[in-house]
Amino acid sequence: MEFETVIGLEVHAQLLTRSKMFCGCSADYAGAPPNTHVCPVCLGLPGSLPVINRRAVEMTVMTGLALGCRIPPYSKFDRKNYMYPDLPKGYQISQYDLPLCVDGALEFLVDGQRRRVRIRRVHLEEDTARLVHRTVAGESYSLVDMNRSGVPLIEIVTEPDLHSPEEARLFLQSLRQVLRYLGVSTGNMEEGAFRCDANISQRTVDGQQQWPKAEIKNLNSFRSVERALAYEEQRQRAAIRRGERLVQETRGWLEDQGITVTQRAKEYPDDYRYFPEPDLPPIFLTEDDLARIRAAMPELPLARWERFQVEYGLGPQEAALLTEERAVADFFEACVAGDRTLAREAANWITGELFALMRERGCGISEVGVQPRQLRQLIELVQRGTISTLTAKELLGAVSETGTDPEVLVAERGLAQVSDEAQLRAIVQRVLAENPKAVADYRKGKTAAIGFLLGQVNRALAGRANPAVARRLLEEALQQPVE
């Protein structure tokens, strides 16, 4: 029996708002002492009333537009009722039947080919508190930190259009890239700002028979998503072949063991007893609202990747490296400033030397200390023959440390190459006179000897000889007949 794997994803992403979803508490809780970013609304105290965060709504709509969703003019919030220690009110304010965004799609690349996954909905809700599990003196405790409670959260639900663990990983990476480009989420999985539950099932390749799905939780990295889905794919297929009965369930991924385990029976919408949130008004969105939000959107990653290849003549891999992050793509375009002839050199410098500097210092391109105009200046100094490529690479670190323009550093440190032919010709003649053996070797056919002679010329000028000019003058002198 031949199987086809069917995968759908439910992705949660925290929004980068200053305040929480329904109150004025700071949403930036990272590193804060437990239970310090809280108020009566966060804690679900009786009598407290929520107020909608307008910016969170705008960010959700922007995400929906980027994913090609339809934005209904009317939306509302609902109460999702369930009891859990991380939910102080006993319900979560979410959206049920009238979400902000519906019927979209995301295109991404798999082995260089476009794949399209439909987006069922994007809705807005509040995050829950965080549970911290500890064991002290043999006793187990679960502590509750309410700082995360009420942070704006979007849930992006796909249709079951994915068919392999690798596709699921690539989709998630592309989705996170879009969210980061929009500036609506950090997308940092290690901080819980980008989380995913994966639904996976099996069906026959002809679609005539399909088995119940399993929802996998505890996926805290892209690698975990791919590994967990690969394990569950094999587990389900093996169970079917053995004639076992599969049930719809929620399973947890155990990273250290590389397996999924049963947690509970899968919930259904009726289990949550959704009903409209009575303390919040509905949301009405006009065409003017959508036009304003659309006007604030940047060019999206896939479109920019394609444009870089067409406009700047870059290869797919170069364009992918440059467009992986919006800040890097912006830096590249600011450096090139419309001059296509600089594109290749700028791409090489950014993906080579500048990326190496960023890795060394553990920072992003906006913190590395080099401005786009400074990198362009460095490239132009090399192209004009003012400095060598080696000197330019050394200067890049100095620019990063001091913020000083390359032209100023070249002047201050006397790094300009000697390109004057009269001056170089005199030194060439002296070097040839002082090294008759190397000259004889070259004239006997040992052309590698010119490297030694070039080194002597460079040494005489403290490494500032223009290598191209010096080599040409050496070759001309060596080809002269012996007197």
Swiss-Prot record:
Enumerate the InterPro entries for this protein. Answer: Asn/Gln-tRNA_amidoTrfase_suB/E, Asn/Gln-tRNA_Trfase_suB/E_cat, Asn/Gln_amidotransferase, Asn/Gln_tRNA_amidoTrase-B-like, GatB, GatB_C_1, GatB_Yqey_C_2, Gln-tRNA_amidoTrfase_suB_CS
Q: What class of enzyme is it?
A: ligase
Q: Provide the alphabetized UniProt keywords.
A: ATP-binding, Ligase, Nucleotide-binding, Protein biosynthesis
SMART domains noted in UniProt: GatB_Yqey
Q: Does the keyword Cytoplasm apply?
A: no
Q: Does the keyword Protein biosynthesis apply?
A: yes
Family note: Belongs to the GatB/GatE family. GatB subfamily.
Function per UniProt: Allows the formation of correctly charged Asn-tRNA(Asn) or Gln-tRNA(Gln) through the transamidation of misacylated Asp-tRNA(Asn) or Glu-tRNA(Gln) in organisms which lack either or both of asparaginyl-tRNA or glutaminyl-tRNA synthetases. The reaction takes place in the presence of glutamine and ATP through an activated phospho-Asp-tRNA(Asn) or phospho-Glu-tRNA(Gln).
Query: Subunit structure, per the record?
Result: Heterotrimer of A, B and C subunits.
NCBIfam families annotated for this entry? gatB, PRK05477.1-2, PRK05477.1-4
Protein name, UniProt field: Aspartyl/glutamyl-tRNA(Asn/Gln) amidotransferase subunit B
Its gene? gatB
